[in-house]
Amino acid sequence: MRSAGREPLPRRSPRWRRASPLCETSAGWRVSQLRRDDLRRPSTMKGKERSPVKPKRSRGGEDSSSRGERSKKLGGSGGSNGSSSGKTDSGGSRRSLHLDKSSSRGGSREYETGGGSSSSRLHSYSSPSTKNSSGGGESRSSSRGGGGESRSSGAASSAPGGGDGVEYKTLKISELGSQLSDEAVEDGLFHEFKRFGDVSVKISHLSGSGSGDERVAFVNFRRPEDARAAKHARGRLVLYDRPLKIEAVYVSRRRSRSPLDKDAYAPSSSVVGTSVGSHRHAPGGGGGQRSLSPGGAALGYRDYRLQQLALGRLPPPPPPPLPRELERERDYPFYDRVRPAYSLEPRVGAGAGAAPFREVDEISPEDDQRANRTLFLGNLDITVTENDLRRAFDRFGVITEVDIKRPSRGQTSTYGFLKFENLDMSHRAKLAMSGKIIIRNPIKIGYGKATPTTRLWVGGLGPWVPLAALAREFDRFGTIRTIDYRKGDSWAYIQYESLDAAHAAWTHMRGFPLGGPDRRLRVDFADTEHRYQQQYLQPLPLTHYELVTDTFGHRAPDPLRSARDRTPPLLYRDRDRDLYTDSDWVPPPPPVRERSARAATSAVTAYEPLDSLDRRRDGWSLDRDRGDRDLPSSRDQPRKRRLPEESGGRHLDRSPESERPRKQRHCTPSPDRSPELSSNRDRYNSDNDRSSRLLLLERSSPVRDRRGSLEKSQSDKRDRKNSASAERDRKHRTAAPTEGKNPLKKEDRSDGNAPSASTSSSKQKPPSQKQDGGTAPVAASSPKLCLAWQGMLLLKNSNFPSNMHLLQGDLQVASSLLVEGSTGGKVAQLKITQRLRLDQPKLDEVTRRIKVAGPNGYAILLAVPGSSDSRSSSSSATSDTAASTQRPLRNLVSYLKQKQAAGVISLPVGGNKDKENTGVLHAFPPCEFSQQFLDSPAKALAKSEEDYLVMIIVRAKLVNSG
């Protein structure tokens, strides 16, 4: 009769035989989702308890006998027929079966996404008995090794879905085998799990009761949801054709609600439970190393579980796998932010070669001011080579430099430095390789010393960061030359003009929350001479173009650049380096917008569009001028030839009146978004509306820029004709003696002491009036500011037409020093060869020299933009001027402001044997020091707060005497 009670069980044995391959290869991927969900829990325990190579059919008989033995034990001395046996099962063992059924329902609700059939539930709640009896029944009396542990393990496996204060960020991968090396396993697991989020892999050796240590891998995620998604999506994992076992390692953030968990946690472990094939015994043997049950006593947890199930408090089903956009947003395999990922390993048990992590090593790179792309490697083996280090570290990223320091006499330690391409690579290598054995020694890893450069690497970016936002945040620290960034990339490179600006951005932008509090930036220095390969290098945009994408779109594929320029593509980025300088935000003079008055202001309109064109495509670049030395006349010719056909066939050419309302709508929401340099914020006295109008005029369209260039060339021809006629008139006026007249009283005379200088200055003055004084207010202020010099200022391979007007001091000082040292004739160009930092002690020294020199020993001049044809009209132009590129004066002003320095020129040019007649010229950009020399007439002559230089000339003999 007892056999009748066991008769239905063999009919379920084929189900078990079919499930046994899952039990043996619990990490395989070749099983459907339904079978995986139905058989997850029984396959887990059976796969751990039995060897995968044992026969599968013997399992059914053993399950049947074990079930019979269990029914006898639970039934006590029940009846001998089938009905009495059934009553015994439902009566005497109601409590145990209720637990099994409830646990199976809980597991079914957690893992079955589409619902299961009744047969699957029947199979599920009978599985704990099978698992418990498979051990031979000897662990039945043990509270840790029998059904209590399996039930507690089953309950713990449902904990992640329930969220009862228990979560996991770590997956334990076991059954790795011994054929593959630790690095090969770590690298393979990293590539398998990196798509789910920020992940790190650590290999550990756990001491076991078998022949040796068991090698396991801990896959640590930054977020618990990433770990859950990886566990559900990678429930069946085959690595190198070897099925692996995946377990979740739970970390308790608060104590369990079990009534009997007073002594639940072992002092040496923070692991409270495992799922999906958890061990029945502790790795150390006997279960003394870690506790797999949150409750400490299996019976107490079972009572608590029954109580919770009776109240209907079942854990909710697990969340669905994260959307596939996760891979697109996290397509980089490095850390966004590192949590204490490896804190479990030393507690679980570390191998002999694994050094425990310290808390200082777990600081995220967003918070660690020492974090950079250079790693310090200590305790290296004396025989280590560069190839050894590259083999060990090249899987973490691109290694740019390896430096090994061999021990000298009296030293015993070998250390080295390893430089990666960026901070993400070095940080991941630091966490993964700290304590690893290379050759014979476990290495110690720390951060090296950062090497400041003008180029920054910025990490922690993503689709949420537009290019305009990146430029706006980093432009506060100085002038940006280029930004290499494509929206959606995880990193960017920002090139500054100065090292101070880059260092300030490196200091203040580390950890900056760009896009939210959990999206913080990582900043490090990068190599300036190395061009990193990217699929697309986007130039630094204009702010109003980026705010409205449809207007920004027509600038990126600019076909006119390739038609005009023949320079390499890398130079295009350099040409946009000055697009975000502060000089771009200067309000324009009103006559520029009145095209009807073009005849009266031909010289002004001639250089304003040229200024815009040069800033647009030939931005201020001192590094690339060797490859771009075309003369302005030759560069304007192709523009003239293309203009008629392009203006007739394209619709980009619009008048300023038609374009102004449309673009003002784009610019109106962005007054606060315009880039401002922190060092120059106090100098912006113009309102934002005027700044926006300047942008509209200068950034209208490429065709408008070329039309301005054509108008410039046409106006140059008219200027030459006018200057030729004016030249004849001035010859008659300058016949009278000019000595003894006050230069500040009479405009027609520029020098009261030197006749040759007077003649030269008077000849060159009317073009300056056309250039700088085309309006009535400027002409009215000209009598107070006589023209002292006209020519070219040179800096490296660029020349800047300028005119100098006397502000203070003696004009004789300027006339006697602004000459050729060898011939004594008037000099046509002044080359800046040195810079003077605008530090307060140095400014005080300049002030002291002016006071010591006295009223006849110095001259202060105001340099404003000169006419563009001054070089051609000057008879003393040299080969240096002919080989350089002409640029507007505001580019020189912007360069000096960005460098926070003044240009220095030794006078006279070329040196002088007469030591008594020497001096120094300082060219100061707009700053607090230079503002003290400007009065209202001088400001009216300058027309703009960002388009002038203050020149201070002091005689050297007076300097030496002071």
Curated annotation (Swiss-Prot):
Residue ranges of domain RRM in the record: 169-251, 373-450, 454-528
Residues found modified as N6-acetyllysine: 449
Pfam short name (any one): SPOC
SUPFAM superfamilies, per database record: RNA-binding domain, RBD (SSF54928), SPOC domain-like (SSF100939)
Biological-process GO terms, alphabetical: branching involved in blood vessel morphogenesis; dosage compensation by inactivation of X chromosome; negative regulation of myeloid cell differentiation; negative regulation of transcription by RNA polymerase II; placenta blood vessel development; positive regulation of transcription of Notch receptor target; regulation of alternative mRNA splicing, via spliceosome; regulation of megakaryocyte differentiation
Phosphoprotein in keyword set: yes
GO molecular function: mRNA binding; RNA binding
Modified residues (Asymmetric dimethylarginine): 577
Alphabetized CDD domains for the sequence: RRM1_RBM15, RRM2_RBM15, RRM3_RBM15
Any one annotated GO CC term: nuclear membrane
Membrane topology listed for this record: Peripheral membrane protein
Start and end residues of each stretch annotated as Disordered: 1-167, 257-297, 553-779, 866-885
Annotated ranges, domain SPOC: 778-957
Source organism, top-level taxon: Eukaryota
Main subcellular location of this protein, as a coarse class: nucleus
PTM sites of type Phosphotyrosine: 265
Sequence position, cross-link Glycyl lysine isopeptide (Lys-Gly) (interchain with G-Cter in SUMO2): 245, 405, 419, 444, 745
Result of knocking out the encoding gene: Embryonic lethality around E9.5. Early embryos show growth retardation and incomplete closure of the notochord, as well as placental defects in the spongiotrophoblast and syncytiotrophoblast layers, resulting in an arrest of vascular branching morphogenesis. Conditional knockout mice lacking Rbm15 within the hematopoietic compartment display a loss of peripheral B-cells due to a block in pro/pre-B differentiation, as well as a myeloid and megakaryocytic expansion in spleen and bone marrow.
Modified residues (Phosphothreonine): 567
Biased composition (Low complexity): 82-94, 118-129, 150-159, 268-277, 754-771, 867-885
Spans through the membrane: none
Family membership: Belongs to the RRM Spen family.
Subunit structure: Component of the WMM complex, a N6-methyltransferase complex composed of a catalytic subcomplex, named MAC, and of an associated subcomplex, named MACOM. The MAC subcomplex is composed of METTL3 and METTL14. The MACOM subcomplex is composed of WTAP, ZC3H13, CBLL1/HAKAI, VIRMA, and, in some cases of RBM15 (RBM15 or RBM15B). Also a component of a MACOM-like complex, named WTAP complex, composed of WTAP, ZC3H13, CBLL1, VIRMA, RBM15, BCLAF1 and THRAP3. Interacts with RBPJ. Interacts (via SPOC domain) with SETD1B. Interacts with NXF1, the interaction is required to promote mRNA export.
Function: RNA-binding protein that acts as a key regulator of N6-methyladenosine (m6A) methylation of RNAs, thereby regulating different processes, such as hematopoietic cell homeostasis, alternative splicing of mRNAs and X chromosome inactivation mediated by Xist RNA. Associated component of the WMM complex, a complex that mediates N6-methyladenosine (m6A) methylation of RNAs, a modification that plays a role in the efficiency of mRNA splicing and RNA processing. Plays a key role in m6A methylation, possibly by binding target RNAs and recruiting the WMM complex.
Protein name: RNA-binding protein 15
Lineage: Eukaryota, Metazoa, Chordata, Craniata, Vertebrata
